[in-house]
């Protein structure tokens, strides 16, 4: 399509080009509007740029107060951002009516929500990060000093018979953290040679990072932290619905605030977020059933324990048959390939594995075809070690 000068100016503010079949949205494109536009591919023969223009043309036809494309282009040229923001909100509202008929869920995958969650407890942070599709960055216990940070306790805990004891124990752990941190700084400054570092700042930074790495295992889960979270809107809806059903009041309160803030910037796709009733109904009865089993517990572990709990049968054959099937040279289903692999001997199996893996570099993921089966472990460890493992979720 040939665009007018005004259309060109307007489009170039929201897309990287107007003359190619491959283009990106710029940062000026509202996330929800992008999701609606992307979803439009399934219902329209028009290009995304043309559909984008058509939205504003239809709005101006139905609303005489709405700006025309020419007026919007002038707003772009003169950097009149409030006028553009108002037009974008109208466009998102306009498209959300179409989205109701289309169906929401696949559109939510194309929209991303971003949260800043500050001054929450580390216990809450671990539950907030319990999402496979979310991306999280948390205040680092390895690089930042938590000595001056306050502690966060749920009001119900403080009001309980355990409230004073909980606060006292957490305060004692913070005292121990500060003392150990100071001692470890002195220790690592003594054992790390200044000559091995280009600058004094680099030497000091490394010594202190090693000190934090040791002392952080004493931090109680009630210490304050902050984190950022980014996730697709479908996952935002699922995750907040699960958090709203949490038995922990701090989590429910945070989830309500997350929902309120997310609906301010993404009302069209997140208007129906409610507590997950299945989780609300299930958690209590299942916990009660488990408590009533009264099975004998093993002796409490005196040190960390790692035990292999289960492994999928034939997991190596599953991976190799999947890799061979992906070559599209055998014309056999994976089940048939797996049965044939049983009879070819260990050396031939090793050859297949080598062919699939020997070109893998230090930064390459495992082949996708190897994402088969499961390996489960039972771990007994302290909160600090679990916190380190949890941040490497998959």
Model regions: which residues?
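A conserved ligand/cofactor-binding region detector
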Residues: 1-394
């Amino acid at each position: 399509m040939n665009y007018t000068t005004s259309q060109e100016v307007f489009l170039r503010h929201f897309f990287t080009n107007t003359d190619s079949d491959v283009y990106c949205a710029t940062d000026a494109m509202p996330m929800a509007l992008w999701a609606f536009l992307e979803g439009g591919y399934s219902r329209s023969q028009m290009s995304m740029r043309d559909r984008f223009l058509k939205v504003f043309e239809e709005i101006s036809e139905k609303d005489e107060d709405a700006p025309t494309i020419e007026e919007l282009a002038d707003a772009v040229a003169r950097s009149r951002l409030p006028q553009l923001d108002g037009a974008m909100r109208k466009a998102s509202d306009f498209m959300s009516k179409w989205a109701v008929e289309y169906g929401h869920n696949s559109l939510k995958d194309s929209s991303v929500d971003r949260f800043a969650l500050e001054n929450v407890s580390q216990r809450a942070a671990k539950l907030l990060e319990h999402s496979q599709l979310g991306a999280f960055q948390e205040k680092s216990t390895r690089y930042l000093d938590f000595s001056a940070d306050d502690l966060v306790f749920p009001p119900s805990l403080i009001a309980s018979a355990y409230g004073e004891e909980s606060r006292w124990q957490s305060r004692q752990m913070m005292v121990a953290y500060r003392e150990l941190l100071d001692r470890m700084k002195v220790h690592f400054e003594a054992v790390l040679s200044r000559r091995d570092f280009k600058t004094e700042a680099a030497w000091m930074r490394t010594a202190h990072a090693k000190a934090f790495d040791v002392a952080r295992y004493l931090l109680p889960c009630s210490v304050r932290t902050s984190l950022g979270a980014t996730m697709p809107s479908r996952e935002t809806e699922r995750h907040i619905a699960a958090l709203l059903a949490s038995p922990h009041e701090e989590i429910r309160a945070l989830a309500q605030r997350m929902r309120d803030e997310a609906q301010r910037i993404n009302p069209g796709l997140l208007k129906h977020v409610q507590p997950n009733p299945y989780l609300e109904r299930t958690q209590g009865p299942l916990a009660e059933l488990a408590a009533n089993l009264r099975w004998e517990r093993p002796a409490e572990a005196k040190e960390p324990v790692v035990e292999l709990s289960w492994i999928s049968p034939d997991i190596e054959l599953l991976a190799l048959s999947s890799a061979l099937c992906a070559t599209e040279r055998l014309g056999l289903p994976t089940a048939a390939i797996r049965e044939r692999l049983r009879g070819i001997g260990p050396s031939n199996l090793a050859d297949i594995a080598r062919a699939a893996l020997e070109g893998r570099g230090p930064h390459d993921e495992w082949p996708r075809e190897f994402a088969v089966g499961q390996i489960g472990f039972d771990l007994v460890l302290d909160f600090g070690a679990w916190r380190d493992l949890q941040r490497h979720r998959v």
